[in-house]
């Protein structure tokens, strides 16, 4: 297997920018149509950004800004 299978994606979030759980439109970019959080190798985020993103998505789900699962999926 070569590294050509995965294209390097540029992160839409600049390093150092905060990831806010209230920014639902940004969080939706990192969630599949079934409601799962995309892995870091697909999002192009740094490890810290991916951890912050996961925390933000989970917080948004708990306060009902994002669904836990997609109703159509």
UniProtKB/Swiss-Prot annotation:
Cellular compartments per GO CC: cytosolic small ribosomal subunit
Any single GO BP term: translation
Protein's UniProt name: Small ribosomal subunit protein bS18
Disulfide bonds: none
Keywords noted in UniProt: Ribonucleoprotein, Ribosomal protein, RNA-binding, rRNA-binding
Family: Belongs to the bacterial ribosomal protein bS18 family.
Pfam families hit by this protein: Ribosomal_S18 (PF01084)
Job of this protein: Binds as a heterodimer with protein bS6 to the central domain of the 16S rRNA, where it helps stabilize the platform of the 30S subunit.
Assembly and binders: Part of the 30S ribosomal subunit. Forms a tight heterodimer with protein bS6.
GO molecular function terms attached to this record: small ribosomal subunit rRNA binding; structural constituent of ribosome
InterPro entries cross-referenced by the UniProt entry: Ribosomal_bS18 (IPR001648), Ribosomal_bS18_CS (IPR018275), Ribosomal_bS18_sf (IPR036870)
Highest rank taxon of the organism: Bacteria
């Amino acid at each position: 297997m070569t590294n050509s299978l995965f294209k390097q994606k540029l992160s839409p979030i600049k390093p150092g920018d905060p990831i806010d759980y209230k920014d639902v439109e940004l969080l939706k970019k990192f969630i599949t149509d079934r409601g799962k959080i995309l892995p870091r190798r697909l999002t192009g985020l740094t490890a810290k950004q991916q951890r912050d993103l996961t925390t933000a998505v989970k917080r948004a789900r708990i306060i009902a800004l994002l669904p836990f699962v997609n109703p159509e999926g």
